[in-house]
Amino acid sequence: MVETQEQPGAIRRYRRIARRIIEHHFGQPPSRIVYKRSGRTNYVFAINHVEGQFVVRISPEPEKTEAFTKERWATQKVREVGVPSPEVLAVGNIGSEPYMITRRVTGSEATHHPRRNHIVHEMGRYAQIINSIRTTNFGANFDWTTNESKNATWSDYLDKEWDFQRRLSVFSKHEMLSSHQIDGIKKIIDDTRTMRIQPSLNHGDLRFKNVIVDDDGEITAIVDWEECLSTIAPEWELSIALHDLTIDEKNSFIEGYGLDLTHVETMSPLIKAFNIINYSNAVEHAAATEDHKSLAEFRLRLSGSLDLYSLTNAARERASA
């Protein structure tokens, strides 16, 4: 996935396309178009129009139509159960380039808002609602698409889409984890194969950067649903949502979700296993680019040496050496 190039010529071209899209959908051109740098694969424009304020996202990648379609399905589903999210008005193509029109959301990214504990408590509450939406099949392709490439079982997802064994081999190849640690993670994941898992909707990246709040710290929208998936919950959701939080914020999220602390303790090994294994792509990228600094930092992080709240296996092994 290549980020959009910040070239004036390309921006002017996509601004003209955005104007055509808006005029096509609303019958008259916008009064103002402002380019919004996204740093991702889309060209994003804020639109002022007599019909309201909108956002147009245009991708140079033809396959992005599926991601936009998925986002429309997910936002409609969660809005039905009271989760604030952007209203997607249209998904289409202009030539080979997909686009999506949404109603503009008011507010700003939650990351630096002073009421973080309040916000994260609400994030937990909304996560529970999102995870209560039952789905069929496992992985990125589920109810939103008629694509027949779906995983009917949890084991299918682990082996085919998530590519569990290959991911584990990354940690061995780059000496991120000991064979004992890898065996332990493998057992945790393999034990889930015999569980009766009812898949449900997971946002897949429910972090501050994907939460929009107003001045009072009230959530106005949860955004970026492209990575949502049908999978086990709440373990998968928590493995990502808790990743960047302080210990107090973790507690607030869990409280907002309504989880019993004993239940969290029971789920903890699986949450940690998901979190660790999802580092495999980052480790591979660092190795491919010969980023030795990042590799060393990943190795330190995955050893548990930065965990100040429990004695990890690695720490106990060093203590007994």
Describe the role of every protein-language-model region.
Residues 9-29, 128, 132-204, 214, ...:
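An alpha-helical support segment within catalytic cores of ATP-dependent transferases
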Residues 32-153:
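ATP-binding pocket architecture of kinase catalytic cores
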Residues 199-201, 207-209, 213-268:
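Active-site Asp-x-Gly
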Residues 271-281:
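Hydrophobic alpha-helical segments that form the core
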Residues 36, 199-200, 274, 290-294, ...:
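The feature marks helicase ATPase cores and/or their adjacent C-terminal helical subdomains
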Residues 51, 97, 197-199, 218:
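Conserved catalytic motifs of the protein kinase core domain
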Residues 72-73, 118-119, 237-241, 301:
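Glycine-rich, phosphate-binding/catalytic loops in enzymes
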